[in-house]
Design a protein with these regions (language model features):
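A compositional/biophysical signature of low hydrophobicity enriched in polar/charged and small residues
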Residues: 1-157
């Protein structure tokens, strides 16, 4: 199954699961007018095809006192050390997103911290990585929205 093999039923099932991954298949089936078995089989096919990679929780980090979000551009001294640096960054729990980029920086990451002192500590930890030549930090003053599943609304079937 490829993206082009999704039909309207698959897309509607995805819409329900994107809204709430814990929606029972029977509830999805009832709302769609199909059997729960059909929902189960189609979800399994989308999982097998790698379209559905699992389910996850959305955590409100502000409720856990992680109120400070910073984006960090990382310039490496040697670009052939990118994978090595990514592994090190992956080991820092406050680094919540990592991307290899073109342009001014080799790597771009998102960090969540409790406050400016916590963010400073994490940025210093990143700067201490041997292959890191320099970093540039951008403080998020407001997260307007964060929706990793938003694109599904634009996928055409």
């Amino acid at each position: 199954m490829h993206n082009s093999q999704l039909d309207k039923i698959d897309k509607k099932i995805l819409d329900f699961l994107v809204e709430n991954t814990r929606t029972p298949f029977t509830e999805i089936a009832n709302q769609m007018g199909i059997s729960a078995g059909t929902v189960h089989v189609r979800v399994k096919k989308m999982e097998d095809a790698g379209i559905i990679l699992g389910s996850s929780l959305v955590i409100n980090y502000k409720k856990l006192n992680y109120n400070f979000t910073t984006y960090v551009g990382i310039l490496l001294s040697k670009s052939n050390k990118t994978q090595e640096v990514l592994k090190i960054l992956e080991g820092i729990p406050n680094v919540t997103e990592l991307s290899v980029t073109s342009g001014k920086y080799n790597i771009f990451c998102k960090i969540r911290a409790k406050d400016t002192d916590d963010a400073k500590r994490i940025i210093y930890q990143i700067n201490d990585i041997e292959e890191v030549m320099r970093t540039e930090s951008m403080i998020s003053i407001e997260e307007y929205f964060s929706d990793k599943n938003r694109l599904i609304n634009a996928v055409e079937v």
